[in-house]
């Protein structure tokens, strides 16, 4: 509401508070209806504060003079966080209703600091707050030092926190007669996914705390308990009745059974249990089941242009799916994330910035204890009592390293003993990997000793668990998933061999046989033979495994952790965007379209930061509009491509450009241009207005002159700075200022105006050499700017790798003949747009002298004719240069002009040249 004050506030707190911790909220402009403005603004502010999920809310002002003009209402009455208010004085307010509103709102405060020179009982009467909630502050300096110092205030907050925690614990211990309502969204049995079986085991435990409706997209649910204790609905029901629920819990895995959850989560926020960290296979299936570019969009959203580029560079999609996490949308839309391992939580921290406003926790995979009867299980499966059974549980696939186990078993002494069997309890891979396993079994003639069961029902799966002597569960290329089959084996007390891949590295070494992540085949052979030959070792592993399952993975323990996580995450189910919009609609339904757009924009800007990484915006306005393929544009392309291929850790790269709409200027994403530059299809993304947030960086890599000036007048850079975006410009030179005669008339004035804007709005200016940086420093000292703090001027060197600038291709038909002429004699080369300061006339005159003196050498000029959009009278010496070249007697003999050639051709010209002439003035 007061944009002109924000920059000074940020500067005041610089060094005391991270800039990312200064958050800005937005409200529409004050319209004709002041009452509507106040109500809309209060709603926007309240939900902005809720989205931050604060521990405390401190209001430093409420009853001060003119405070009725400000939006300072504490928050909604049902707020989940305590509020403290400072009351410095109470003045008469013209609008008595405004006073009453503030007094009513003050009653929400958990604590009221006052500096009013009145007895406490009088303050209670005036303010309407409880005596216990008032803390009187004296303003005398000595009193502040001795009585109300930082330690004293710290103690107040500490005591209140303890009081609130105690109150929370009392609430938690109350009888759950009115259980909150939970929508549980997950595939369920009989669907062939581990998440379905997991949910069937978890639901009875959650039912102790919640009234549960299950949301599925399947023909029927086979689990008896679920049918008897839960109401079953489909996703359409949830979409239409979401407000009936206190919480929504999503279970997200990597199979097609979870596709319907993606659409639900987009419109109904909830807590997501992420069973597979990557879930890229899910979006690949989404794209192949009727959602065009679903994988492209998720790759772009989460990994940026680099991942999209790689997709079209790879021969197939398998590699891109394997290498890239596609969970960004899920994480951004979730109120909180639950993982089953520390490994997945670690992946979250490694992949995304800590400032991302998403909470996460780790809840171990639960396992229900089953009373297994080994003898009965073996009898039902046809396994003899004296047979030694090694099992690997779960679907077969390359990441499960089943072939590795098979080869180790065949190499071990177990394979030569008829009483030993290897059983893969699961469905074989349908691709070449599964075929390889079958061929290996056939080749070694061990069909009677090695078995692949195919998909087994839950009852049969448990029989194999009860009948096994050893389990081997191997992994590679972990995607953050938790191996439920390892816990199954441990739950049944099966001595289990695993390798330290992903979350399995967290298993206790005395409860499993833990191999290195990348182990030798001989290591696995040794483990198999040792456990076969040493029953006491098997017994010890079995005992410890059961102990860990009982103490860490029991349903009662995990259920309590789920309840704590669900209750502790932001309760925005009934305070979320859907409710906010419902509350806004009656207030603004009769307003103009312009006003509605303002409100919509404020809604977007007020969202708590759920960017998974910060953004480095690269301003390529001039390059994307009319890429002249000349110096500055070539530099801009080269920097852009390098950043796309090697983004700084914690940042995504977003090329942007300035655009004008009805007098207002904005930055838009340069998606169409960038995808074309990367040789990717560009019809699936639009150039939307950018969404910048605190901690982002804008780097202007080319020269957009007048558009930058107009954008500054429109408030573009002020708004970015207010949001906490760092603004950085490149200055290539000061030549229009230093040599105005070398540029079109008036260019020095427009350039000076651009330079003043750059120096006014930038946090840092990057020059292309120390010499330019020194010149700019002098120029800044001789000009005055409205700046809060000094301008940071730095410099860098430019590179010269033509191949990394997205070079243009194409060779004219006469190229071979021309290049042959260059190779026949000494050839000197000039490269650059034909402009007054490039020294063409002087160079041609010098060569005329050399030719007259008998030197048989070539002069090659490569470059377009400059300033062609201007009349000749404004082009200085350019017409004279062009006329000189075109009418020269040596043209195409020993003087060559290659106008607008491709970069591919230019590289060959460089290779055929003897020397480069750099005749430019001020270069």
Where are these regions (language model features)?
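Carbohydrate transferase catalytic cores enriched for Leloir-type hexosyltransferases
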Residues: 1-377, 381-383, 387-405, 410, ...
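Short alpha-helix at the nucleotide-sugar/activated-sugar donor binding site of glycosyltransferases
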Residues: 77, 489-491
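A short alpha->beta transition loop at the rim of the catalytic pocket in nucleotide-sugar-dependent
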Residues: 469, 491-493, 914
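Short glycine/serine-rich donor-binding loops of glycosyltransferases
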Residues: 482-486, 504
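Short hydrophobic beta-strand element within catalytic cores of glycosyltransferases
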Residues: 495-498
């Amino acid at each position: 509401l007061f944009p002109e004050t924000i920059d000074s506030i940020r500067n005041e707190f610089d060094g005391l508070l991270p800039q990312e911790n200064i958050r800005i909220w937005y409200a529409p402009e004050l319209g004709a209806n002041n009452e509507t403005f106040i109500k809309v603004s209060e709603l926007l502010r309240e939900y902005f504060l809720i989205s931050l999920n604060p521990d405390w809310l401190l209001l430093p002002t409420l009853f001060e003079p003119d405070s009725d003009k400000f939006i300072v209402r504490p928050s909604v009455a049902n707020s989940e966080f305590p509020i403290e208010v400072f009351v410095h004085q109470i003045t008469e307010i013209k609008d008595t209703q405004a006073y009453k509103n503030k007094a009513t709102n003050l009653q929400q405060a958990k604590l009221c600091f006052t500096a009013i020179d009145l007895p406490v009982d009088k303050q209670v009467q005036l303010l309407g707050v409880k005596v216990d909630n008032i803390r009187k502050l004296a303003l005398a300096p000595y009193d502040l030092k001795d009585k109300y110092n930082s330690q004293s205030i710290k103690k107040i907050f500490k005591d209140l926190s303890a009081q609130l925690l105690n109150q929370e614990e009392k609430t938690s211990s109350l009888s759950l007669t009115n259980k909150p309502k939970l929508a549980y969204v997950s595939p369920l049995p009989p669907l062939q996914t581990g998440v379905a079986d997991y949910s069937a085991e978890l639901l009875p435990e959650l039912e102790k705390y919640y009234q549960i409706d299950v949301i599925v997209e399947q023909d029927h649910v086979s689990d008896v308990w679920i049918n008897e204790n839960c109401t079953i609905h489909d996703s359409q029901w949830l979409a239409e009745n979401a407000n009936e629920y206190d919480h929504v819990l999503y279970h997200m895995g990597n199979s097609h059974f979870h596709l319907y959850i993606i659409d639900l989560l987009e419109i109904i926020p909830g807590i997501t249990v992420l069973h597979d960290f990557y879930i890229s296979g899910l979006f690949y299936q989404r794209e192949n089941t009727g959602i065009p570019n679903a994988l492209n969009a998720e790759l772009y959203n989460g990994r940026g242009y680099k991942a999209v580029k790689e997709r079209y560079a790879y021969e197939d999609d398998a590699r891109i799916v394997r290498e890239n996490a596609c969970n960004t949308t899920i994480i951004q839309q979730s109120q909180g994330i639950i993982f089953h391992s520390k490994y997945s939580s670690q992946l979250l921290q490694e992949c995304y910035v800590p400032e991302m406003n998403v909470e996460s926790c780790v809840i171990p995979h639960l396992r229900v204890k089953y009373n297994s009867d080994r003898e009965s299980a073996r009898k039902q499966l046809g396994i003899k009592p004296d047979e030694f059974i090694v099992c690997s549980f779960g679907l077969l696939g390359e990441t499960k390293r089943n072939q590795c186990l098979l080869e180790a078993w065949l190499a071990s002494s177990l394979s030569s003993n008829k009483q030993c069997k290897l059983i893969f309890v699961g469905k074989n891979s349908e691709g070449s990997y599964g075929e390889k396993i079958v061929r290996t079994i056939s080749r070694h003639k061990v069909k009677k000793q090695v078995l692949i069961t195919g998909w087994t029902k839950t009852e049969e799966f448990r029989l194999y668990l009860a009948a096994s002597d050893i389990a081997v569960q191997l992994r590679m290329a972990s995607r953050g998933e938790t191996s439920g089959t390892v816990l199954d084996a441990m739950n049944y007390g099966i001595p289990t061999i695993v390798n330290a891949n992903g979350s399995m590295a967290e298993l206790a070494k005395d409860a499993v046989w833990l191999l290195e992540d990348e182990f030798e085949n001989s290591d696995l052979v040794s483990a198999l033979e040792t456990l076969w030959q040493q029953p006491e070792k098997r017994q010890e592993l079995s005992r410890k495994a059961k102990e860990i399952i009982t103490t860490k993975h029991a349903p009662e323990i995990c259920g309590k952790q789920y309840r704590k996580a669900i209750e502790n995450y932001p309760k925005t189910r009934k305070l979320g965007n859907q409710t906010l919009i419902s509350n806004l609609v009656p207030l603004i339904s009769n307003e103009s379209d312009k006003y509605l757009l303002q409100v919509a924009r404020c809604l977007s800007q007020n969202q708590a930061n759920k960017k998974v990484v910060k953004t480095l915006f690269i301003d390529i306005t001039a390059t994307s509009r009319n890429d002249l393929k000349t110096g500055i544009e070539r530099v801009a392309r080269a920097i852009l491509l390098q950043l796309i291929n090697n983004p700084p850790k914690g940042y995504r790269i977003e090329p942007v450009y300035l655009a004008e709409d009805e007098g207002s200027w904005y930055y838009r994403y340069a998606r169409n241009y960038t995808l074309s530059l990367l040789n990717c299809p560009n019809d699936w993304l639009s150039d939307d207005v950018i969404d910048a947030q605190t901690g982002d960086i804008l780097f202007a890599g080319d020269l957009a002159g007048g558009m930058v000036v107009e954008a500054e007048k429109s408030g573009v850079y002020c708004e970015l700075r207010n949001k906490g975006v760092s603004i950085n410009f490149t200055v290539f030179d000061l030549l229009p200022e230093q040599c105005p005669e070398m540029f079109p008339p008036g260019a020095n004035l427009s350039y000076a105006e651009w330079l003043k804007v750059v120096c006014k709005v930038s946090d840092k200016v990057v020059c292309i050499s120390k010499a330019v940086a020194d010149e700019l420093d002098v120029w800044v000292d001789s000009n005055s700017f409205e700046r809060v703090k000094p301008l940071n001027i730095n410099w860098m060197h430019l590179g010269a790798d033509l191949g990394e600038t997205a070079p243009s291709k194409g060779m004219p038909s006469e190229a071979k003949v021309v290049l042959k002429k260059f190779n026949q004699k000494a050839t000197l080369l000039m490269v650059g747009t034909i402009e007054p300061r490039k020294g063409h006339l002087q160079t041609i005159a010098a060569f005329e002298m050399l030719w007259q003196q008998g030197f048989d050498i070539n002069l090659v000029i490569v470059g377009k004719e400059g300033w062609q959009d201007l009349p000749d009278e404004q082009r200085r010496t350019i017409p004279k240069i062009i006329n000189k070249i075109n009418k020269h007697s040596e043209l195409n003999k020993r003087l060559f002009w290659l106008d607008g050639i491709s970069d591919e051709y230019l590289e060959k010209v460089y290779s055929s040249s003897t020397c480069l002439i750099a005749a430019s003035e001020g270069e």
